[in-house]
């Protein structure tokens, strides 16, 4: 089976779809470009399907390199047969390749190797091949200076047999089947650690056991974290060790023969000392990998929802980074997000300069014609919100904005480059203000892991996490589109086909030559060639440019089709964009070619319906319950407004405007069964919740979204 056939089977796609998608990827096309502008080639595959093909292609490519290494290593040992090469070449299962390689894999000096050095290999083979012979008698002929008793000879033979059993593919497969069906994951507190403060959060796992196949990703990752911190000891074993040993031994032990006891001892040793630890390690790795995949999926879903949160748009904004002792950092931004003014006010304890702070805020709101105020939701956030609302300034909207990652940004090289003359507090306030105006444009400057929507993000595979999050950011940026004349280099970096180097070149060119008047002007940017232009042009927008199509997602390679449509309708392109009736009268089949079919033509008309539209909607004003300031103010049964901050497999965390986030367990999300919480809620969604339980000692709040109307 070829890699293309294998991917097609795994993803339930046609081979032609996979073949053409891989060809496009190998030519340097990006996932957003392929899914948006090459629908005819892929058979209409969406971004998720294209990404899945790309990931499978990457994994199989890695396996191909591994297979080449295995063949080379075995060949160097002079042990490569035609049959062995054929098996490796035809295998697309990494576990099978590992099993084939195992007997040839260089290893530390083992008990079996030491026994072979003593000349005991023939004895081991006699026990296996002539089990009717007397083992004691056979062992007599192998005594020498290093082997002084028959039992020593038999022990060495058993060591050789044990290693042979542990490296036998069939033995390993037998135990794998047992693990797959009935493996149990067990967690115990490490002796002397249970009463330590750091162990408290793992209390649920001090004496925990469940079938591995039922262990959810968050439980498994919690146990593994406890293990890495030295609090828990985690094992994965068959439900019945004796039965597993018997099944492994069955292939080798011939009941009733004289050698049966020796072979059984060797098989038991193989199972306990070599085989079970090896398969346990394998299942620990695969179960962790599966848990990682699920945690990364949850993280990527949350990140996507956060990045695609509705923007307020180009408005004059006041950003406030609240604080008590250090004061509140206040900045005023123009409609493009440029910093106009900054100062610090001290309305809260210990200074309590409330009147002076109110006067300063009124002055700034007026002087800079502020249209909206963005207040960080961290320390002193609620108190600052109440202060600003009490001013009752007409025409000014007030928003609490997530501070997650703002401090990371403010101390970053990007922030220093943007604001070299300001300290971290001013940069943080600017980030909060800009985050309200355009969450996507601001959040791309921050490492996604610092945004606070991950589930065990520090415990999962770092490489897989980075690939997924980078792909998520790229997907969001290209789904929205980017204003070529206002976008930062950071935002442009994620545009299809660009990257950091070309993004910087675009900004440098824009600074030197002024705004771009046309997408075609991109070709004047140094080192931006035809391929990069093909990949990026459709995702870049020029507002009020020379060609109205430059403010749409219509790709420049298809402008001629729109021009033909306009000519056939007896008008120019701007008139066609403004005339929905004329567009409805068009017969799309007239414009079909070998390269361009109805999917692309339908997309073109959809773009002409709403040129330059932002798919994210618009930010809505939200207020927390004014009487709630801490967990002490909560009462069971209260119905409160909240904002979803994180969605996990087991439910959703909700911000109630206090330090402690509440949890709506998956069973409390709706009056029906919910398999995936993302079916019901999303990050940044405004919800109403009912307080079910309050555990002040552990800082936990249980909430429900049932019966809250």
Language model region names:
Residues 1-19, 26:
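Generic start-of-chain signal for non-secretory N-termini
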Residues 3, 61-79, 89, 408, ...:
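Long, highly charged, low-complexity intrinsically disordered interaction regions
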Residues 33, 49-52, 59, 63-319, ...:
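Duplex nucleic acid-engaging cores and interfaces of nucleic-acid transaction enzymes
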Residues 37-39, 128, 239, 322, ...:
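Short, ordered loop/turn segments at secondary-structure junctions
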Residues 73, 87, 98-101, 226-240, ...:
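Structured, non-catalytic alpha/beta "coupling" segments that mediate domain-domain communication
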Residues 177-184, 320-324, 378-383, 401-408, ...:
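A glycine-rich phosphate-binding loop feature that marks nucleotide/adenosyl-phosphate handling sites
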Residues 542-546, 550-709:
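Single-stranded RNA-binding regions, centering on S1/OB-family and related RNA-binding modules
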């Amino acid at each position: 089976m070829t890699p293309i056939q294998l991917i097609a089977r795994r993803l339930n796609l046609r081979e032609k779809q996979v073949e053409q998608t891989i060809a496009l990827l190998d030519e340097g096309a990006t996932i957003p470009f392929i899914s948006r502008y090459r629908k005819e080639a892929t058979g209409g595959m969406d971004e998720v399907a294209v990404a899945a093909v790309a990931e499978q292609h990457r994994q199989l490519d890695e396996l191909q390199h591994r297979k080449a290494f295995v063949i080379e290593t075995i060949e160097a040992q002079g042990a490569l047969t035609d049959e062995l090469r054929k098996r490796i070449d035809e295998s697309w299962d990494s576990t099978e390749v590992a099993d084939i390689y195992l007997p040839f894999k260089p290893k530390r000096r083992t008990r079996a190797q030491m026994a072979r050095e003593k000349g005991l290999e023939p004895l081991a083979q006699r026990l296996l091949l002539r089990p009717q012979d007397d083992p004691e008698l056979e062992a007599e002929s192998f005594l020498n200076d290093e082997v002084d008793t028959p039992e020593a000879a038999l022990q060495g033979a058993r060591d050789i047999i044990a290693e042979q059993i542990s490296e036998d593919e069939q033995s390993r497969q037998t135990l794998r089947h047992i693990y797959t069906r009935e493996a149990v994951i067990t967690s115990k507190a490490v002796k002397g650690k249970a009463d330590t403060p750091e162990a408290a959060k793992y209390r649920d796992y001090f004496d925990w056991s469940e079938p591995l196949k039922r262990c959810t990703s968050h439980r498994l990752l919690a146990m593994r974290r406890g293990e890495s911190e030295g609090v828990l000891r985690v094992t994965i074993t068959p439900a019945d060790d004796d039965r597993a040993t018997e099944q492994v031994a069955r292939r080798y032990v011939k009941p009733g023969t004289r050698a049966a006891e020796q072979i059984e001892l060797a098989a038991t040793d193989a199972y306990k000392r070599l085989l079970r630890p090896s398969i346990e390690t394998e299942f620990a790795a695969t179960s962790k990998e599966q848990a990682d995949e699920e945690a990364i999926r949850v993280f990527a879903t949350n990140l996507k929802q956060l990045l695609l949160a509705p923007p307020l748009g180009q408005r004059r904004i006041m950003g406030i980074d609240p604080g008590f002792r250090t004061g509140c950092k206040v900045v005023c931004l123009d409609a493009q997000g440029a910093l106009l003014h900054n100062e610090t006010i001290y309305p809260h304890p210990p200074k309590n300069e409330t009147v002076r702070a109110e006067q300063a805020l009124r002055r700034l709101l007026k002087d800079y014609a502020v249209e909206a105020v963005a207040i960080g939701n961290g320390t002193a956030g609620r108190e600052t919100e109440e202060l600003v609302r009490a001013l009752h300034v007409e025409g000014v909207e007030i928003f609490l904005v997530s501070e997650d990652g703002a401090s990371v940004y403010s101390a970053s090289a990007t922030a220093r480059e943007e604001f070299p003359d300001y300290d971290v507090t001013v940069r943080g306030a600017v980030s909060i203000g800009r985050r309200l105006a355009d969450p996507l444009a601001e959040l791309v400057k921050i490492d996604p892991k610092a945004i606070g929507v991950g589930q065990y993000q520090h415990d999962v595979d770092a490489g897989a996490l980075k690939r997924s999050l980078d792909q998520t950011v790229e997907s969001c940026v290209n789904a929205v589109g980017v204003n070529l004349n206002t976008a930062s280099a950071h935002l442009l970096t994620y545009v299809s086909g660009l990257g950091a180097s070309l993004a910087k070149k675009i900004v440098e060119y824009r600074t030197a030559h002024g705004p771009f008047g046309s997408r075609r002007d991109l070709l004047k940017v140094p080192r931006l060639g035809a391929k990069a232009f093909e990949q990026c042009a459709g995702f870049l927008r020029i507002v009020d440019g020379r060609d109205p199509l430059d403010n749409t997602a219509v790709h420049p390679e298809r402008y001629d089709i729109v021009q033909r449509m306009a000519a056939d309708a007896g008008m120019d392109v701007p008139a066609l964009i403004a005339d929905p009736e004329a567009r409805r009268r068009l017969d799309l089949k007239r414009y079909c070619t070998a390269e361009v079919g109805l999917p692309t033509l339908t997309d073109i008309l959809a773009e002409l319906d709403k040129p330059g539209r932002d798919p994210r909607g618009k930010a809505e004003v939200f207020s927390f319950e004014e009487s709630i300031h801490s967990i002490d103010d909560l009462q069971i049964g209260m119905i409160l407004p909240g904002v979803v901050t994180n969605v996990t497999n087991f439910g959703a965390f909700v911000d109630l405007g206090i330090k402690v986030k509440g949890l709506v367990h998956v069973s409390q999300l709706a009056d029906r069964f919910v398999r995936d919480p993302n079916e019901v809620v999303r990050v940044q969604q405004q919800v109403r919740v009912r307080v079910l339980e309050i555990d002040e000692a552990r800082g936990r709040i249980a909430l429900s979204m049932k019966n809250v109307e």
